[in-house]
C-alpha cells in the first residue's frame, strides 16, 4: 500500500528497528555484514540462528523482513515492514537505494520524516522537528533512474542467489560473542 524510498536497505532495516523499538532481534548467522550492524546501531540485542535462507528472511520476532534478494509481484506480507535493496548487484539496479514497503499509514509518515533528518519534506525553517532522524533519503537522481527501470521490470522474478553464500558472521571478532539459538 505504501512505499518509502531510502538511501539503502541497511538504513531501511535500522529505521524499522527504531520505529518498532526492537529489543532483541534474531537473524541468520549468514547474511550481509551491515544487517547485524544496523540492529546493533538501533540499540537492540543481536542473536543468530544457523539456517540457510533464500530471497528474504524475518528479523525475528518483529514483522521486519530483509528482502534485499527478492523483488517480485505478490511478495508483500500484510502487516509487515519489508525492506528492499536497489544496489547495483540487486534486481532493480539503480546503483544505490532502498525502500520500505508497509500497509501502515502511521509508520509511513514516521519513516518519511525519519529518513529526512526528522523533518517533513519542506524547508527546515518552516518545519517543527519532532523526531531525531537520519540523512537517509534516496537522491532524486536515483529515484528517477528507479522509475525509469520499473517501466520494463517483469512481474515475476526469481530470488537472487548468493554464490558463494554469505560468510558466517560469527567468524568476525565483532560478532564472536553473539548467542546462537
Question: Predicted segments — roles?
Answer:
Residues 11-14, 81-82:
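Phosphate-group recognition and catalysis centered on beta-loop-alpha active-site segments
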Residues 11-12, 31-33, 68-70, 88-91, ...:
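Short, solvent-exposed loop/turn segments at secondary-structure junctions
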Residues 81-181:
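Active-site region of PLP-dependent enzymes
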Amino acid at each position: 500500500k505504501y512505499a518509502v524510498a531510502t538511501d539503502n536497505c541497511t538504513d531501511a532495516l535500522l529505521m524499522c528497528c527504531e520505529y518498532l523499538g526492537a529489543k532483541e532481534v534474531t537473524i541468520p548467522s549468514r547474511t550481509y555484514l551491515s544487517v547485524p550492524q544496523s540492529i546493533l546501531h538501533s540499540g537492540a540485542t543481536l542473536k543468530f540462528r544457523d539456517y540457510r535462507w533464500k530471497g528474504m528472511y524475518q528479523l525475528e520476532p518483529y514483522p521486519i523482513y530483509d528482502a534485499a534478494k527478492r523483488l517480485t509481484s505478490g511478495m508483500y506480507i500484510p502487516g509487515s515492514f519489508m525492506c528492499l535493496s536497489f544496489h547495483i548487484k540487486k534486481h532493480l539496479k539503480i546503483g544505490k537505494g532502498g525502500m520500505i514497503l508497509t500497509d501502515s499509514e502511521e509508520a509511513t509518515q514516521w519513516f518519511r520524516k525519519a529518513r529526512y533528518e526528522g523533518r517533513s519534506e519542506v524547508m527546515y525553517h518552516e518545519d517543527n522537528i519532532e523526531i531525531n532522524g537520519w540523512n537517509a533519503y534516496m537522491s532524486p537522481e536515483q529515484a528517477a533512474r528507479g522509475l525509469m527501470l520499473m517501466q520494463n521490470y517483469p512481474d515475476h522474478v526469481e530470488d537472487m542467489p548468493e554464490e558463494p553464500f554469505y560468510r558466517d558472521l560469527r567468524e568476525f571478532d565483532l560478532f564472536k560473542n553473539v548467542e546462537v539459538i
